[in-house]
């Protein structure tokens, strides 16, 4: 081998080694990928999800078909890690009417019981919606916290976390606000369910992750771009490398659930593996 060939080969090897080192952090076994499935079991679809390497699923409640879902999940060894509270938009904890707030709280309690029954650990909750003078930002903050705190004994009894998600509802559009809201709930049972794509519109997703820190217990996986809105993973403005870096810094471990469409669950599996280093 001549000197020129040696130097070229060595430089190439060093570059590959550097790339390998830069990509060496893997979240395999640390982040568990899942998809959302609704309220009814679909054994064929669940089997495909399992075959594609997903670690679990997330359902909706109330209305979850608890016993049939438990049976299929057990047969396939595909756990349901939690549920989304399906009524939080229509029947809100922040509604101006106290009777509606009570109804929403009771529905959330049922969702918590359903989550426990299927072996889950959490309920995803949107705490309210800013609609006007009778339901402004402060109303959403105060009313939702009042209702959530009434459910803290149940959360502890069931060992179920109430995980707050920020969406395009006029509430907590700054990561510092969301952090402070979680802290105002004043309970280890109330933490963050951070949606990576939802909040990219208001501040880079990796900044949200950094500011929320260890308050984030679970992730919704989405992408969003200023030109194309919600889109397949990897086609928006989310900087996935920076997202991974911040997740590593906060020592995140837990569930990451895809919400959205990538043209097939097989493509979703591949994209999640690539973008989350699974």
Regions found by a protein language model. Give the residues of each.
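Alpha-helical segments flanking ligand/cofactor-binding loops in enzyme cores
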Residues: 46-47, 71, 113, 153, ...
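Histidine-acidic metal/acid-base catalytic patches
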Residues: 4-34, 40-50, 120, 175-190, ...
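Conserved dinucleotide-binding and phosphotransfer motif residues
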Residues: 52, 76, 158
């Amino acid at each position: 081998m001549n000197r020129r060939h040696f130097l070229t080969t060595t430089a190439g090897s060093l570059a590959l080694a550097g790339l390998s080192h830069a990509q060496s952090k893997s979240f395999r076994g640390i982040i568990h990928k899942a998809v959302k499935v609704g309220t009814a079991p679909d054994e064929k679809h669940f089997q495909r999800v399992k075959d594609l390497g997903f670690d679990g699923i997330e359902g909706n409640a109330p209305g979850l078909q608890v016993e049939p879902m438990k049976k299929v999940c057990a047969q396939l060894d595909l756990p349901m890690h939690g549920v989304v509270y399906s009524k939080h938009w229509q029947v809100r904890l922040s509604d101006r009417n106290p009777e509606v707030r009570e109804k929403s709280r009771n529905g959330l309690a049922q969702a918590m019981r359903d989550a426990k029954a299927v072996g889950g650990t959490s309920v995803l909750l949107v705490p309210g919606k800013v609609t006007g003078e009778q339901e402004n930002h402060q109303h959403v903050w105060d009313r939702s916290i009042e209702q959530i705190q009434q459910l803290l004994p149940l959360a502890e009894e069931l060992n179920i976390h109430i995980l707050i998600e920020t969406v395009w509802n006029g509430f907590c559009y700054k990561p510092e606000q969301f952090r402070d809201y979680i802290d105002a709930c004043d309970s280890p049972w109330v933490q963050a369910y951070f949606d990576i794509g939802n909040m990219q519109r208001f501040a880079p997703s990796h900044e949200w992750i950094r500011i929320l820190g260890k308050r984030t217990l679970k992730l919704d996986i989405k992408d969003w771009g200023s030109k194309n809105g919600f889109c397949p993973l990897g086609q928006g403005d989310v900087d996935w490398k920076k997202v991974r870096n911040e997740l590593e810094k906060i020592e995140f471990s837990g569930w990451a659930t895809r919400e959205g469409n990538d043209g097939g669950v097989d493509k979703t599996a591949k994209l999640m593996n690539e973008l989350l280093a699974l």
